[in-house]
C-alpha cells in the first residue's frame, strides 16, 4: 500500500474567474511538480485542435460562378464577402448541418442578422458585416453550415458530390474550432510544508458557441479517453499469416519440348538443365549465347517462339521452381 510520501497529489482547489461569456480563467491546484506544464500543454493543444464547432463550408451567390467575380451593386468583391461569411459564429442545436438563405436589396449594410434562421440555429454575432449594398444593389445567397473539428481545407475535406448542388457553389476552407485563444501559466503552489508544487492557470477565450468552462471539461474528457488505453495496456497478439506463393502461369510448367524447337536448340537447352519454359524465360540472351553449340540463329528461334506465347527472356519469377516440380 502506498504511503503519503509516494502518493500523487490531486488538485483539490479549482477556481473559475469569468470575465465575459467568451473568456474565463480556470485555475487548479495543487499538482505535483512538473505536472502543471505536462497537463497544461496537453489541454491547450486539445482545446486548439480538437474541439467540435460549426462553420460555413459552402456558399452559392446568385449570379456568381467563382470567387473572383463581382456582384453588381455590392461594394465588396466575392472574395471579401466569403471572408466575412467565415467570420459569422453559428451554433446548431440537435443537427450537424443546415442550409441557410440570405436575401436583401436596397442601400445599406448586409449583416449576419439578415440571414433567415430556423428555430434550432443561432447566430451569435448578428451584427457582423457581410457586405454593403448600393441604392440599386441586391444580393441573394445560400450558405451551408456544418459541424466539424479543427481546421479542414477544401482539398482535405471529403466533399460529397450532389447532383442537385447549385451551379457556382463555392467551397470554403473551414475553421470549426470554437476556441479563439488559449494560454496557460504555471505558478508555484504550497500545501502545508511542501512548496515545490504547481498551480495551473488556463486562460481561455471562445467564439461564444461554447462556454470556456465547458470547453475545459470537454478537453479533459478527450484527454482521459485517449489515455485510458494505457491504463489497461495489453499487447495484441500478432497472427502469423501463412505466406502464399504467387500463382504460376500453367504455361511455364510445360516442358521446353512443347515449344517445338529444332532438335539442336532443344538439346542445347537440356544440356544447361533448362527443362521447363519457366526455366528458359529466366535466362538472358547473354547467358544463352554462352551455351555450347547454341548460336544467334537458335537464339532468334527461341525468342520468336516465346514471343508468340507472350513471353520474353530475362523475366523474373518468384518461388521458382514450385514445390514438387521434377525433371521430366
From Swiss-Prot:
Checking SMART domains in the record gives: RPOLD
Residue numbers spanned by region Alpha C-terminal domain (alpha-CTD): 248-328
User: So what EC number does this one have?
Assistant: 2.7.7.6
**A biological-process GO annotation:** DNA-templated transcription
Record's keyword terms, sorted: DNA-directed RNA polymerase, Nucleotidyltransferase, Transcription, Transferase
NCBIfam families hit by this protein: PRK05182.1-2, PRK05182.2-5, rpoA
Family classification: Belongs to the RNA polymerase alpha chain family.
The subunit structure is:
Homodimer. The RNAP catalytic core consists of 2 alpha, 1 beta, 1 beta' and 1 omega subunit. When a sigma factor is associated with the core the holoenzyme is formed, which can initiate transcription.
Q: What role is this protein assigned?
A: DNA-dependent RNA polymerase catalyzes the transcription of DNA into RNA using the four ribonucleoside triphosphates as substrates.
Q: What is known of its domains?
A: The N-terminal domain is essential for RNAP assembly and basal transcription, whereas the C-terminal domain is involved in interaction with transcriptional regulators and with upstream promoter elements.
- Which HAMAP family does the entry link to? RNApol_bact_RpoA (MF_00059)
Q: What is this protein called?
A: DNA-directed RNA polymerase subunit alpha
Organism listed in the record? Neisseria gonorrhoeae (strain ATCC 700825 / FA 1090)
- Lineage of origin: Bacteria, Pseudomonadati, Pseudomonadota, Betaproteobacteria, Neisseriales
- What gene name is listed for this protein? rpoA
